[in-house]
């Protein structure tokens, strides 16, 4: 029943006719993107759920030195309310200094929970090594953990990961190529030559010939004004132009772990006959004891009797006619009552036989 439902939903989704979509929904402007930031810091104020690792102590000692407090070299602070953490955030395009970012804080060591902790000032750096934001604040942790004296433990969700809403202040903005050059380039989220050509045609229909040109299956280049304010207005007009994306190529996607099968609308089959049966072999071992007569000169022996049974389930053979469609394929699969693993075997065999017109993708 589950297989029938999954296949039916997939068939419905892929059978829907393509509809026009706005350019902003199917493409991005080249160079306008977010940037990842990461930092290393300390969370303090934990209620005994911190850690005592060596690198935690070193980080704690370094922090104290920055405040002018020097500890003896052989002194090891006993701390249970501190944890070392990784802090990361996404920095959107065009964000300016003084604006705020949400940050995620994750434990790096043996801390049991970050609940109730506070992140101390942490520099967030980009891939170029420059500091772009500074994070600090109290954590919001949805998970929790509790330990009993008898060794029992209760953990819900993930207590070693938390978030700080608006927990980082941007100190430096990232330059983008948006306001430079004579062109804007749109990159399709799903590469397709037909969709790229249709996008260029739709833009040219509105703005005039030769304003847009497809560069490849992903990129469409558009002539744009150099004035920044005009460029913003120009882009606002472009991103609301509607384009009808091209049909997807014929694909069959199979998740071998979950048994989910998605069949594209354009998948077709050449003439083929399929039958699928299962061979079951059962081996049973029976142990018997041979006990000689009490007055006989014999020894007690143990013998094993093996019983082997083999059975093969019979399945009806079904045939695919030329140009078999998605609907007919689904009905045929349901007719034989095939399990997801059986369907995968059938699809692989059809692909090897050259009867499956479409790309078989196993994930």
UniProtKB/Swiss-Prot annotation:
InterPro entries: Flag_FlgI. Assembles around the rod to form the L-ring and probably protects the motor/basal body from shearing forces during rotation. One of its GO terms (biological process) is bacterial-type flagellum-dependent cell motility. GO terms for cellular component: bacterial-type flagellum basal body, distal rod, P ring; outer membrane-bounded periplasmic space. This is Flagellar P-ring protein. Its main location: periplasm. GO terms for molecular function: structural molecule activity. PANTHER family: FLAGELLAR P-RING PERIPLASMIC PROTEIN FLGI, FLAGELLAR P-RING PROTEIN.
């Amino acid at each position: 029943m589950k297989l029938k439902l999954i296949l039916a939903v997939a068939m419905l989704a892929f059978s829907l006719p393509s509809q026009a979509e706005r350019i902003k929904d199917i493409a991005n402007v080249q160079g306008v993107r977010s940037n990842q930031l990461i930092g290393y810091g300390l969370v303090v104020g934990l209620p005994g759920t911190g850690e005592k690792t060596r690198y935690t102590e070193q980080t704690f000692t370094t922090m104290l030195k920055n405040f002018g407090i020097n500890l003896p070299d052989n002194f090891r602070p006993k701390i249970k309310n501190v944890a070392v953490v990784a802090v990361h955030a996404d920095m959107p395009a065009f964000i300016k200094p003084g604006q705020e970012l949400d940050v995620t804080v994750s434990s790096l060591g043996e801390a049991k929970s970050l609940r109730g902790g506070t992140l101390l000032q942490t520099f967030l750096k980009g891939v170029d090594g420059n500091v772009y934001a500074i994070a600090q604040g109290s954590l919001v942790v949805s998970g929790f953990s509790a330990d009993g004296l008898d060794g029992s433990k209760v953990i819900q969700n993930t207590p070693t990961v938390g978030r700080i809403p608006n927990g980082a202040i941007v100190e430096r903005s990232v330059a983008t190529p948006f306001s430079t050059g004579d062109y804007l380039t749109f990159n399709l989220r799903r590469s397709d030559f037909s969709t790229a050509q249709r996008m260029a045609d739709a833009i040219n229909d509105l703005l005039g010939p030769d304003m847009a040109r497809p560069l490849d299956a992903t990129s469409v280049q558009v002539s744009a004004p150099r004035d920044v304010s005009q460029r913003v207005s120009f882009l606002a007009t472009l991103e609301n132009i509607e384009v009808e994306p091209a049909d997807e190529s014929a694909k069959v996607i199979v998740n071998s772990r979950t048994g989910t099968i998605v069949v594209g609308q354009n998948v077709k089959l050449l003439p083929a006959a399929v039958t699928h049966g299962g061979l079951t072999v059962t081996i049973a071992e029976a142990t018997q004891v041979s006990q000689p007569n009490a007055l006989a000169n014999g020894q007690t022996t143990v013998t094993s009797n093996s019983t082997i049974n083999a059975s093969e389930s019979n399945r009806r053979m079904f045939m695919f006619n030329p140009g078999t469609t998605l609907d007919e394929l689904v009905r045929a699969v349901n007719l034989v009552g095939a399990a997801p693993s059986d369907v995968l075997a059938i699809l692989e065999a059809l692909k090897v036989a050259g009867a499956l017109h479409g790309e078989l993708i196993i994930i």
